[in-house]
Amino acid sequence: MVIEKRESFIEVVINSLLNDNPAQAKFDKYSILVSLGFSSLLSVILLCIFTLLRTKFNTYDRCIPPMKKSLWGWIEPLWSIKVEDCLYNMGADAVISLLFSRFCRDVFLILAAICCTILIPINIVATNKTLANSDSQNAYAKLSIQNVTGNWTWAHVVICYVFNVLVLFLLARYYQIVMRIRQRYYRSPTYQQSMSSRSLLIMDIPTTMRSNNGLSILASRLKSSEAPMHVHICHAIKNLPKILKKHDNAVRSLEAVLAKFFKNPKKLPDDRPVRRVKQGLLTSEKVDAIDYYSAKIENYGLRVDAARESLYENEFEHYGFITYKSSYIAHDTARHNSRVAGASVSMAPEPSDFLWDNLSLAWSTRLFNRMIGNILFIILIIAWIIETALVAIFISNLYHLGSVWPWLQQQLTSRSGFWSIVQGILSPAVAGFTFMILEIIMRRISYWQGSFTKSSRERGVLNKLHIIFTLDNFIIYTLMAVFWRLGVIIAYKTKEEGNFAEGMSAFATFDTVGLSVSSFVQFSTFWIMFIAHSTCSFFVEIAQPITLTIRLIKTKFFSPTPRDLLEWTAPTKYVYSQVLNKLIYFFTIAICYACINPLVLLFASVLFCVNYLTQKYILMYVSNSSTESGGGYWRPVVNRILLGLELANIILFLCLWVQGGRVRAYCIIPNFSFAIAFKIWCMFALDPKSHYMIEDPYMKVVEPLENEISESEMCFGHPSTYAPLLVPMVRSDARALLPLFYSGRTETHNKFDFATDSDDASEKHLRGEEEPLENVDFVDIDNVDTAKEVHDQQQVQQLKKNLSRSYTRSRGVSLRARLNEEELPLTESITQDSQISIPETLESQSTEITPINVSEHYDKYYHIF
């Protein structure tokens, strides 16, 4: 019997790392093919599902622009309509987001054509001449710069200059387009008619000036061509938003109880619905659920009314608003005044864009939260390296996991086909799932740091996501295999020498830079799989299989409330930080591999083409902007594009340095100055014309007359001070049975025969002689589209009533002659939208309402996809 010494764990790992493994190269090849095949098949299936369901459920008469009823009728508007012409339909943020997607598409279509036709043949020829046994090499390695040395790399230097000039040239052209679009947005009727376009937000007002008279004195110190028309400093609202939220939760709870009880009005349950209420620490009793929630609704409603009536008895906040006659005067004043008397000055955002809780925070609190938030972000970056290491080392390359798991190593050898499928699907899926978690964490940190507006919070999320994606999920993710190899070698050396100090000596002889560059080049196969899977994800967004499945299950097996049904018909909210971060992430990956592995460019060009078409359809027919910042995302996006360009230059410089071409590496250095010079040019030539409205004698700015500005239009403050209270929604076929079970007040008129209140009714509301508001809103669940339209009209009418009441009017100081009471129009808009405007509160308290121009965008309410 012969006894053989068994290799130790460290020796097995060392052999697997240091020795070339032809099986692994074949395994990686099949993994890429499986990944591409799976992504292509799933994309085709999702596209077919979307095409079939769209023709069945779409409401064509309300689509703007209209679509044909054919299977592929949805593609024609995407080709025929220019993005620039959709400004008034989609908004500036949506247009600029699509322009950035189109910019990426143009860049990578041109780069893919250049690099694939020039660099790939050069790489193949150079690899065959460099390596005698090139036939045994990985086919993907032949397409890259991995084995290219000598004068062959001059082609990569030339291409580096080409893509730097190309990116900056196209970026300059798109920058000018964005500048013109933002100026068109500033001059649009929708923006001009909004109160916020003519107002300044004054933050951190000194204690001695926290009054309307003090704010008037502060306004007189501003460098402005004209005096302001109106100033208003806000009052503290204390616990009013919490009471309003409890009221809305009680309404939704009552709706859930009634929806379950009246699920089948022809066959009601024998017993009334009940719920358990705590009576003590350990005891509870059953009470009638309908009566319980009805009492809570009435109680919270009275508390909300009392809090609103006593609002102006509260102390003043440290922020206020100054309103001018025209938007140009407000922009010009904001341009020349950043601070005055210790207070900060900026353009007032839209009412729906405010984060009112953060607006009330003191300067010291915001500073402390910002500091703690940055510390937490740094800790998260470091902690996320562990997750990145596990995924990068073991999931993206199962042979690394097999080196420490003998059973898996045996399986990889015997069943390589099956495990290549697992690696091709699992690794990009796990990476995508971890990226989703990051976005949620970043948004919470940005909110806690004290962002004033939702758009600034989203820009903060974009900045943080870009840092952690580029650092952790791209650079460290790609180089983690090198760190793994270095750690194993140090452990092996320590065991062999019996001394950790001797083990660390291996670090001195370890070719860190060379192996890092080699790992970066070899990791291109993973990024090809990841880009292919991400392309498939865009078809998931447009087909919405998960959302439709969840809603189908809820509809068939549960009891959704009428409000749920109405909310499902509302357009979804488009999250720009998430979408733009993904595009920047893909741009950074693809541009870094432009000269290293041109095959990545081919897949990136397909990804951006698919993204442009799908996102254009979504923004035209499916989603709305949650808030409108007027294109404020463009400058952060450009900064990150320039950073990605510089990172690509650094990586190519290191590759050429490792390949022995020191002179060729030095030739890359001038490229670093191009992006810096471009940024300086943008700061002085383009940014001032983009951030503020500029005076143009050929474009007339709509300036409202003094007698066209009503007092109700001067309404600033937290939306909870004027938002209509929610009323319970019940299905219309339960109208006759409802009085038997519900003791609250109801209206007997048909909601589908909705009519606006007359002038006499409005006067009654002003005098306080209003009729009791209805406590129940009946909804025909068999005709949700019509019910949605009627309910929206009712909410708008109720909002106008609230704005006409005395406690919601601005009690600021008017710096012009007051109008007579008979001349005060009571139904002016207070938000950005013309004709029908709904503040952010309706969005937050009744999510089926969206702040859009209903006459132009109502098709989105009815469009299922």
Swiss-Prot record:
Coiled coil: none annotated. The keyword Transmembrane helix applies. Residues 53-106, 173-374, 442-470, 533-582, 662-665 are cytoplasmic. GO terms for biological process: calcium ion transmembrane transport. It is found in: Cell membrane. Pfam families: PHM7_cyt, RSN1_7TM, RSN1_TM. Glycans are attached at N128, N147, N151, N624, N802, N853. It comes from the Eukaryota. The chain crosses the membrane at residues 32-52, 107-127, 152-172, 375-395, 421-441, 471-491, 512-532, 583-603, 641-661, 666-686. Residues 1-31, 128-151, 396-420, 492-511, 604-640, 687-865 are extracellular. One of its GO terms (cellular component) is plasma membrane. InterPro entries: Csc1-like, CSC1/OSCA1-like_7TM, CSC1/OSCA1-like_cyt, Csc1/OSCA1-like_N. Its main location: membrane. It is a multi-pass membrane protein. Keywords: Calcium, Cell membrane, Glycoprotein, Ion channel, Ion transport, Membrane, Transmembrane, Transmembrane helix, Transport. The keyword Phosphoprotein does not apply. One of its GO terms (molecular function) is calcium ion transmembrane transporter activity. Acts as an osmosensitive calcium-permeable cation channel. Belongs to the CSC1 (TC 1.A.17) family. This is Uncharacterized protein C354.08c. It comes from Schizosaccharomyces pombe (strain 972 / ATCC 24843).
